[in-house]
Amino acid sequence: MARVKRGVTAHAKHKKVLKAAKGFYGRRKNTIRTAKAAVDRSKQYAYRDRKVNKRNFRALWIQRINAAVREFGLTYGRFIDGLNKAGIEVDRKVLSDMAIHEPEAFGALVNAAKKALEYLKEAGTANEFEGAVK
């Protein structure tokens, strides 16, 4: 059997790792052993932070919705409750965007949520609001 020399594949692998480590500080960018460890760790951080990013954006959307809804005299929790009771299914990302870029449409949603809350308060039931916007 012929002898296999690994110089070409080893060089290619090292080149791949060092390319991923480009921009790192100190020996991490040009020493293969430290670069490999740094790249592996960077992948772990990237995986973790993709999840953290989703949490952060959801929190940001909720803060924006809360700030916009308080101008209409409601809290975030009451507003979401009113939307659910009115049968309006809009996610928080869209609500946040509407609050910033389309305040009139957002105001209509707030009024629909208020109407649903008042209707159910008067009726004393937990059924869905008949005048729901679907």
From Swiss-Prot:
GO cellular component: ribonucleoprotein complex; ribosome
A GO term, aspect molecular function: rRNA binding
Record keywords, A-Z: Ribonucleoprotein, Ribosomal protein, RNA-binding, rRNA-binding
Transmembrane segments: none
InterPro entries named in the record: Ribosomal_bL20 (IPR005813), RIBOSOMAL_L20_CS (IPR049946), Ribosomal_protein_bL20_C (IPR035566)
GO biological process: ribosomal large subunit assembly; translation
PROSITE patterns per record: RIBOSOMAL_L20
Pfam families per record: Ribosomal_L20 (PF00453)
Similarity comment: Belongs to the bacterial ribosomal protein bL20 family.
UniProt cross-references to NCBIfam families, sorted A to Z: rplT_bact
Its job: Binds directly to 23S ribosomal RNA and is necessary for the in vitro assembly process of the 50S ribosomal subunit. It is not involved in the protein synthesizing functions of that subunit.
Alphabetized PANTHER family for the sequence: 39S RIBOSOMAL PROTEIN L20 (PTHR10986)
Protein name in the entry: Large ribosomal subunit protein bL20
Organism: Rhizobium leguminosarum bv. trifolii (strain WSM2304)
